[in-house]
Amino acid sequence: MLDNLELPDNDRPIYQRLADAIGERIARGELVAGERLPPHREIARSLGINVTTVTRAFSALQQRGLVEARPGRGTLIALRETEESSFKSAPSDEAGLIDLSVNRPATSAYRDALATLLPRLAKDRRFANLQDYHPPEGPPWARVAAADWLNGIAGDGDAGRVVLTDGAQHGLACVLRALAERGDIILADSITYQGISALCRSQGLDLRGLPIDREGMRPDAFEAACATLRPRAVFLVPSLHNPTTVTLSEDRRRALAAVARRHNVLIIEDDVYRPLLDRVIPSFAALEPELTVHISGLSKCIAPGLRYGFVVAPRAVLGNVAAALRIDCWSISPLTALVATNLLEDGTATRIIDVQREELRRRQAILREVLAAFDVQTDETSPHAWLHLPEPWRGAGFARACRQRGVGVLPADAFAVGRETLAHAVRINLGAAPSLGDLRQALAIIAELLNAGHLEISGAV
């Protein structure tokens, strides 16, 4: 970790030069979030300096936001908001890297469909209206198509309850801005999609993580939090959860919905992965339609470049959501709406999703074969998998070791709500590999590391 550490040759005090040297390794990605730095005495002994100097250097690093001290756990590399692993949406262009850290569909079916669709758009009767302003909720014809698409899942086909957004993340931002005030408490799984953490920080909301098990959020923990914290809302990813891949059973959904109903807590349902799911389970919007804001979109199931999302909300709050969107962008691009509406209306969206599911099944089969000996949590049509690491690996150290060998994965710390490390695991995105061969190669490297059964020796020697 701090092998062969050399202090800069300048006139600054030794503690500042030590802080600079460690900070440089963090900036280069040699030290990643969650890794524990060696004890002060060990560093002092290896560099021939006194312990007080090391302590002052660590304090300087804390002031820079690069490390954090945790009682009983020592000093850890901090997870920075700007760090690549904390909220990443684009694959790395690093040469030779098979980047499985980004969640993306596994095929180019959307690109092929778009090439066929674009020449036809100018003949669409709605094309003439593309240069006009549209209501903040979105063009009426697009809302009708979206309501039909979501019928049976949310909204019962009622276009009047649909707001169209520039993707699900934009929808989530509008919902939080519309329905929560600075300082309000939002509940979520203790490990969950990073986007909710980023939004709560930016909007001054107090995000609290609740205990989970292999079936998702625990109803008893939700009940206790509602009784003591008086939360404004609970955020849930009920289908193919990101990152754990858990799909809440109907019983678990009903139990959580009952708690929300007893305490009048709004349910924010992020259901972007539902189209990939190969079974039917009632949504929270179906179980508690007047207490649930349902968010979905096409980016995860069709293509990330198709920034098109849906918010289905109770009529009592729909106007607030639309007003929040209007402040953002007035309304979504009608051109994007026309592209997406055509895909929904002519069945192309369904065909693309079928292709994605089949490709994911092939990739899941490779995963089961190569990592058969390890504790992998996943689902037949999930675009990602959650690898529980054996002793003595920790998420950040394993992600670093993988990257050094040409494979990108995301450690559990990137998904943690709060500052505690709650799982020693990494997320592996199966759809991100350019080909089945690349996926097999990357998984083989991961298996080789796991079979090695040991961490690199860390320390300043």
Question: Where in the sequence are the language-model features?
Answer:
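Short hydrophobic/aromatic beta-strand micro-patches
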Residues: 312, 386-388, 429-431
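Active-site PLP attachment segment
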Residues: 72, 288-320, 332-335
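Hydrophobic residues in well-ordered beta-strands that form the structural core
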Residues: 188, 209, 267-269, 340, ...
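Conserved core of the PLP fold type I
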Residues: 129-263, 274-293, 451-460
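N-terminal basic, amphipathic alpha-helical segments
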Residues: 1-122, 126, 131, 142-144, ...
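Conserved glycine-rich beta-strand-loop-beta hairpin in the small C-terminal domain of fold type I
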Residues: 357-368, 376-389
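Amphipathic alpha-helix from the class-I
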Residues: 316-320, 338-355
